Amino acid sequence: MTEQYLELRDMKSNDISKKVSLKNKSELKRKLEPYFYLIPAFIIFGLFVFYPFVKTIVMSMSTTNIRGQIKEFVGLENFKEILTSPEFYNSIVVTFKFVVMVAAPSVIIGFLLALLANNKLRGNRVFELMFLLPMAIASAPAAVIWTMIFHPTNGILNYVLGTQIGWLTDSKFALISVAIVTVWLNIGLNFIFLLTGLKNIPSELMESASIDGASYLTKVKDIVLPMVSPQMFLVIFMNLINAFQAFGQIKLLTQGGPGDSTNVLVHSIYRQAFFNGRFEMACAQALILFVIMMIVTLLQFKFEKKGVHYQ
């Protein structure tokens, strides 16, 4: 009897341990399962984001041949050369000028057009479509259109103004001209985001303000701007980042010229890599641009806590 009791006890304990083991395996599988679904994303990010970023850091501290193959490690020598280069500082100045010329007008014009389209007027749908058209045009065809507009002899702009200014060939006007094209390209996206925010403002708020005798400008300042501040923050963020990364229209319209008057940092990176064959210098400049954009982004998110009002 004692032996049978011991056998039964062992069998029960084995069954319990098996159940516990299966339960633990099931629990472990449940916890690990979400990570398996993330593996494809990790592979893609690893191949196309993390690996290129690490390779850029390594190349920025090395010398390379004309094919971009690493020859030897040189530490921070490339950064020292860049930081003592007048061309690099010119690119920094041109980049910040371009960012200011593009970001502020793009946001302001997009907001004013959204205010106009939000009013209940005849033909609003037509206006909305017209304002959205630039968003559907790529930088290459846009550059062709604006090259014709800016043409010094046959361009419609000089014809209207009665001048013969070389908008893209005169260093005084080239950066402004490229900024105008970029603003035009940005307006559509800014418009649609801000118009969406305006349409989400409760009409009761505006009606109450009107009953209280508030002027239109007062309503915009005290009601509209706080209510659309999340969309406004997003639009400002996107426009700043896009302005720092602008390349296509600059390459097609001016190729960084005349002189270096439109040679923004991204175009300087392109020129160093594919014209001068100095991939290490291009990588070093790319990392500096990354740091600048990171600082700008952190400053924006610091401002978000004070200036953005979520409903």
PLM regions: where:
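Short, Lys/Arg-rich, polar N-terminal cytosolic tail immediately upstream
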Residues: 1-28
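A structural signal for multi-pass alpha-helical bundles of membrane permease subunits
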Residues: 29-311
